Amino acid sequence: MCRTTRQGDLAEAAFMLRATEVGLKLARPIGGDVRYDVIVDNGRERCRVQVKSTSSLYRKNVYQVKAARQEHYGNRKAPKAVGYLASEIDFLAAYLVPEKTWYILPHAALRGRKILTLYSAGHAKKGPCAEYLEAWDLLL
Protein backbone atom coordinates (compact mmCIF):
# COMPACT_ATOMS: atom_id res chain seq x y z
CA MET A 1 0.00 0.00 0.00
CA CYS A 2 1.43 3.38 -0.92
CA ARG A 3 2.16 5.94 1.78
CA THR A 4 -0.47 8.46 0.64
CA THR A 5 -3.22 5.83 0.57
CA ARG A 6 -2.29 4.69 4.06
CA GLN A 7 -2.20 8.28 5.36
CA GLY A 8 -5.58 8.92 3.74
CA ASP A 9 -7.07 5.82 5.35
CA LEU A 10 -5.70 6.85 8.75
CA ALA A 11 -7.07 10.39 8.34
CA GLU A 12 -10.51 9.03 7.45
CA ALA A 13 -10.43 6.78 10.52
CA ALA A 14 -9.36 9.73 12.70
CA PHE A 15 -12.19 11.84 11.25
CA MET A 16 -14.75 9.13 11.95
CA LEU A 17 -13.52 8.73 15.52
CA ARG A 18 -13.67 12.48 16.24
CA ALA A 19 -17.03 12.93 14.49
CA THR A 20 -18.48 10.08 16.54
CA GLU A 21 -17.10 11.65 19.73
CA VAL A 22 -18.97 14.91 18.98
CA GLY A 23 -22.21 12.96 18.46
CA LEU A 24 -22.49 12.58 14.69
CA LYS A 25 -23.73 9.49 12.88
CA LEU A 26 -21.63 8.36 9.94
CA ALA A 27 -21.78 6.23 6.82
CA ARG A 28 -19.20 5.42 4.17
CA PRO A 29 -19.94 5.21 0.47
CA ILE A 30 -19.27 1.92 -1.27
CA GLY A 31 -17.41 2.09 -4.55
CA GLY A 32 -14.97 4.64 -5.84
CA ASP A 33 -17.27 6.68 -8.05
CA VAL A 34 -18.01 9.48 -5.54
CA ARG A 35 -15.82 12.42 -4.51
CA TYR A 36 -16.61 12.29 -0.79
CA ASP A 37 -15.19 9.94 1.84
CA VAL A 38 -17.81 10.07 4.60
CA ILE A 39 -21.51 10.86 4.91
CA VAL A 40 -22.33 12.75 8.11
CA ASP A 41 -25.86 12.57 9.53
CA ASN A 42 -26.64 15.07 12.28
CA GLY A 43 -30.31 14.08 12.59
CA ARG A 44 -31.57 16.93 10.39
CA GLU A 45 -29.50 16.56 7.23
CA ARG A 46 -26.77 14.51 5.64
CA CYS A 47 -23.52 16.06 4.44
CA ARG A 48 -20.84 14.73 2.10
CA VAL A 49 -17.35 15.18 3.54
CA GLN A 50 -14.04 14.87 1.71
CA VAL A 51 -11.20 14.12 4.16
CA LYS A 52 -7.67 15.39 3.49
CA SER A 53 -4.55 15.35 5.62
CA THR A 54 -0.94 16.44 5.76
CA SER A 55 1.93 15.42 7.97
CA SER A 56 4.61 17.83 6.77
CA LEU A 57 5.11 21.55 7.17
CA TYR A 58 5.05 23.81 4.12
CA ARG A 59 7.03 26.39 6.09
CA LYS A 60 7.41 27.18 9.79
CA ASN A 61 4.05 26.62 11.53
CA VAL A 62 2.23 26.51 8.18
CA TYR A 63 0.75 23.49 6.40
CA GLN A 64 -0.76 23.06 2.97
CA VAL A 65 -3.51 20.62 2.00
CA LYS A 66 -4.67 19.83 -1.53
CA ALA A 67 -8.31 20.75 -1.93
CA ALA A 68 -8.56 19.09 -5.33
CA ARG A 69 -8.78 15.76 -7.05
CA GLN A 70 -6.53 14.49 -9.84
CA GLU A 71 -8.04 13.91 -13.27
CA HIS A 72 -6.46 12.56 -16.43
CA TYR A 73 -7.53 14.18 -19.69
CA GLY A 74 -7.05 12.55 -23.07
CA ASN A 75 -3.43 11.79 -23.85
CA ARG A 76 -1.98 13.91 -21.05
CA LYS A 77 0.54 11.95 -19.03
CA ALA A 78 0.37 14.16 -15.97
CA PRO A 79 -2.95 14.45 -14.12
CA LYS A 80 -4.57 17.85 -13.69
CA ALA A 81 -5.72 19.17 -10.30
CA VAL A 82 -9.44 19.94 -10.37
CA GLY A 83 -11.22 21.69 -7.50
CA TYR A 84 -14.22 20.06 -5.88
CA LEU A 85 -17.67 21.17 -7.01
CA ALA A 86 -20.58 21.97 -4.69
CA SER A 87 -22.44 19.11 -6.38
CA GLU A 88 -19.69 16.71 -5.19
CA ILE A 89 -18.98 17.66 -1.56
CA ASP A 90 -20.52 19.77 1.18
CA PHE A 91 -17.45 19.98 3.45
CA LEU A 92 -13.73 19.40 3.34
CA ALA A 93 -12.16 18.18 6.57
CA ALA A 94 -8.39 18.79 6.73
CA TYR A 95 -6.31 17.01 9.36
CA LEU A 96 -2.93 18.35 10.46
CA VAL A 97 -1.43 15.07 11.63
CA PRO A 98 1.45 16.37 13.83
CA GLU A 99 -0.90 18.87 15.50
CA LYS A 100 -3.81 16.43 15.84
CA THR A 101 -5.93 19.36 14.66
CA TRP A 102 -8.90 19.54 12.29
CA TYR A 103 -10.13 22.27 9.99
CA ILE A 104 -13.78 21.77 8.94
CA LEU A 105 -14.50 23.91 5.88
CA PRO A 106 -17.85 24.22 4.09
CA HIS A 107 -17.54 23.96 0.31
CA ALA A 108 -18.23 27.69 -0.12
CA ALA A 109 -15.11 28.49 1.95
CA LEU A 110 -12.92 26.72 -0.61
CA ARG A 111 -13.72 29.47 -3.14
CA GLY A 112 -12.31 27.37 -5.96
CA ARG A 113 -8.89 27.03 -4.33
CA LYS A 114 -6.99 23.85 -5.06
CA ILE A 115 -4.54 24.30 -2.18
CA LEU A 116 -5.41 25.42 1.35
CA THR A 117 -2.88 27.14 3.60
CA LEU A 118 -3.55 26.19 7.23
CA TYR A 119 -1.74 27.63 10.24
CA SER A 120 -0.66 25.62 13.25
CA ALA A 121 -1.56 26.63 16.80
CA GLY A 122 2.01 27.90 17.25
CA HIS A 123 1.80 30.45 14.44
CA ALA A 124 1.81 34.14 15.41
CA LYS A 125 -1.14 34.84 13.06
CA LYS A 126 -4.48 33.08 12.90
CA GLY A 127 -4.40 32.40 9.16
CA PRO A 128 -6.96 32.63 6.36
CA CYS A 129 -8.98 29.61 7.53
CA ALA A 130 -8.88 30.28 11.29
CA GLU A 131 -12.66 30.40 11.65
CA TYR A 132 -12.81 26.75 10.54
CA LEU A 133 -10.28 25.46 13.07
CA GLU A 134 -12.02 22.64 15.00
CA ALA A 135 -15.36 23.92 13.61
CA TRP A 136 -17.23 20.67 14.31
CA ASP A 137 -20.32 22.73 15.14
CA LEU A 138 -20.77 23.31 11.39
CA LEU A 139 -21.58 19.62 11.05
CA LEU A 140 -23.90 19.47 14.08
Residue ranges and their predicted role:
Residues 114-140:
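Charged phosphate-binding loop/patch that engages nucleotide di/tri-phosphates or the phosphate backbone
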